Regions:
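S-adenosylmethionine/decaboxylated-SAM
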Residues: 1-147
């Protein structure tokens, strides 16, 4: 919705350059990857014909919204993450991984592209003392099965 927030030092130089030298981690948009809420609703409900009763849209930065809604979200079979930056990816993993069922899948869109996304997942594995096999999707995306 708001687009990407500022990256942090963990995201590396390429992310800082992409954000036009904004890299303090402020939860303010850098005006990249913006997706207005009305556009998202149009795609979901008008174009894809997804039943509105099956979708709950929560607007807000991951850091602010996920801690408040992770219990409400419930069990997850496939968790697809596309947060680009370290902090966005890390907060999603920290808040939603426990919701993923054993044998469920975690898909990370930016592992092979953004330094911060890769760092967040690698650190998460170390913290959790897990080492699942990462399966490459393409040049940037990977997925793994929750052990």
């Amino acid at each position: 919705f708001e687009g990407l927030p500022e990256p942090t030092a963990e995201d590396g130089k390429i992310a800082k350059d992409y954000a036009q030298n904004k890299a303090e981690g402020k939860l303010e948009t850098i005006n990249k990857c913006v997706g207005p809420l009305e556009d998202v609703k149009e795609i979901f409900f008008d174009i894809l014909k997804i039943n509105q009763n099956n979708v709950v849209i929560k607007k807000g930065w991951f850091q602010n919204s996920l801690p408040l809604t992770k219990q409400e979200i419930g069990k997850i079979a496939i968790l697809r993450l596309d947060g680009d930056w370290y902090e966005s990816t890390k907060v999603c993993l920290d808040n939603l991984y426990n919701n993923v069922i054993i044998g469920g899948y975690i898909v990370l869109d930016d592992y092979g592209y953004w330094e911060g996304a890769k760092r967040a997942l690698d650190e998460f594995f170390v913290e959790r003392k897990i080492s699942p096999k990462l399966i490459k999707i393409d040049d940037t995306g990977v997925y793994f099965r929750k052990p």
